[in-house]
Amino acid sequence: AGYLLPVQYGTGVIAEHMAVRTKCGLFDVSHMGEIILKGPDALKNLNHLLTNDYTVMACGQARYSPMCNEEGGVVDDLIVYKVRDDCYFIVVNAANKDKDYAWMKAHVSGEAQLSDISASVAQLALQGPKAMDILRKVAREEDIPEKYYTCKFHCTIDGMDCIISKTGYTGEDGFELYCAPADAPALWDALTAAGALPCGLGARDTLRLEAAMPLYGHELSPSINPYEAGLGIFVKLEKPD
């Protein structure tokens, strides 16, 4: 997709994989895409664009969903965070962010606006059974979400503004932190100094595969529908109009 990212660090894929399974690893996944959907008709459009149902959702809650084309094939899979009743923060796969944004723009209707904010957001993924302990060394307790698939939007770490979500792509406990790109190196340094091991995309792939988490371009594609991919639980056929 045109990104220069480490497959592994000096420790190697196996050591990085095991660090996430037993302690804590840190991934730079700033290549992921971020989109804002807002307006009075934001919810209506979410339920139109995505297969999951976003009707009943609290602010600060996150929800996963496939996004499908007219034939039922998967355009992408993504996570939606509810900022407020008329605003949603959407995280999409890096290789698909331009395609996803164009797809959404082509299918949004009514009073709703889309904004691609990918260039102004960096993402670090802190993953593993010790992730909570490490995050507590650098973040305020009130800024740390406790429940899986929830987030805190207005957090600070060493004076840096960030979003902290209790989500991940490894099958382990963990967090994903969103910040300004200029703050990402300092945030990375703070988390590694607190004990997180730098991990590359090689370990990220083995971890997600071991946890049976699909990856677009492999287990997901426009020729594969959510049922074929084992994601039928995220398809809600009856949603409010």
Language-model segments: residues:
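Acidic, proline/glycine-enriched N-terminal capping motif
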Residues: 1-68, 73-75, 202
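Conserved, structured C-terminal
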Residues: 1-11, 83-241
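Short, acidic/polar N-cap/turn motifs at the starts of alpha helices
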Residues: 32-34, 64, 77, 121, ...
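Well-ordered mid-protein domain cores that form the structural environment of catalytic cofactors
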Residues: 53-107
